Each structure stands twice: as structure tokens, then as C-alpha cells.
Amino acid sequence: MSNLGIKEIKVPSNLNLDKQQDTLIIKGDFGQVNYEIDSRFSLDLMENGSLKFYPKKNLVLSERKKIKALWGTQYSLLKNYIQGMSQGYKKTLELVGVGFRVSLIENDLVLKLGYSHEVHFNIPSDIVIQCPSPDKIVIFGICKQKVNEVVSLIQSLKKIDLYKGKGILLENTKLRLKEGKKK
């Protein structure tokens, strides 16, 4: 049994759910998402406005072990989609370093990171990026996985220097600086 999968998923009142065969259509303030339900799982819409997610009973023994491993993962993915459609996911990055700047030009994020050239980052269509100040980037989206992927891609443009404390950091991240060589 999965500790997560047993729990019911509470659906906020601002979302509309519609089940069509193996697809759950989630409509909310931020648009619409189609979640493909694995054919080995069942999904029930409860009367109290929650979802019950469980594996089908008529599975072969060898399949049951695989399903138990996937149950919690599928539950978490569905819960993340529901939370994303109701509230969304937001992460803030800070550029720490002398001369590190960011600007937004149409669908490109232009970063000055101490290189001899500017770095251009193409923004995916389902992600919204804002630059409230020249050293902050706010990333917003409905898919938690996509938001975290974009955050890590932007952070990979400039490796964090643990000796000087420079780089692209998540907001409120405290770096423990390393000591340099001593004579």
C-alpha cells in the first residue's frame, strides 16, 4: 500500500474536473490541462469534491509490484497539477555579483553574467517570467516540474562560486563560503 496514494485529493472550489475515459480534464483560473490517467489506475470523483486514486484490482501479480511503486508517484503528479491550476507555482531567482543584470526582451531573457557576451535564454510558452528589478527573476507556471526545470536551466548559465558567493541563487538562499588557501 502507498502511504500517499491512500489519501484523497481535495479539489479547490475554483476548479472544474471532467473525466473522459482515461483523461482527466482540469479547468481553472489559469486555463485547462489534460491529465492522462495510467490505464492500470482508476480515478473516482467523490461527492464531497475530492478525488480517490487507486490501482485496478484485476492485475497480474507481477504487475502489482510495479503498480505499488508507481502509485505514490502518480498521486503526487496529479496533486501537483491540481495545485498548479488553482494557485500556480512561483520561484524567485536573485543574481548576486558585480555587474550581473537581467532584462526581458519580448520572449527572451537577456542576462549579463560577467562574460564577454550577453546570454540569451528563450522562455518556454507555458512559463511566465518577470523581472521586477535588474537583479531579480520571477518565474511562474502551472506545472511544478516545468517551473523547476526552467529554474535549473537558468541557474546552469552561471555556476555558483562558493569562494566569492556569486552566481544565480534562489531567493533567501544563504551560501556558506569556503575559505581560500592560507600560507
Describe the role of every protein-language-model region:
Residues 1-183:
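Ribosome-associated RNA-binding proteins
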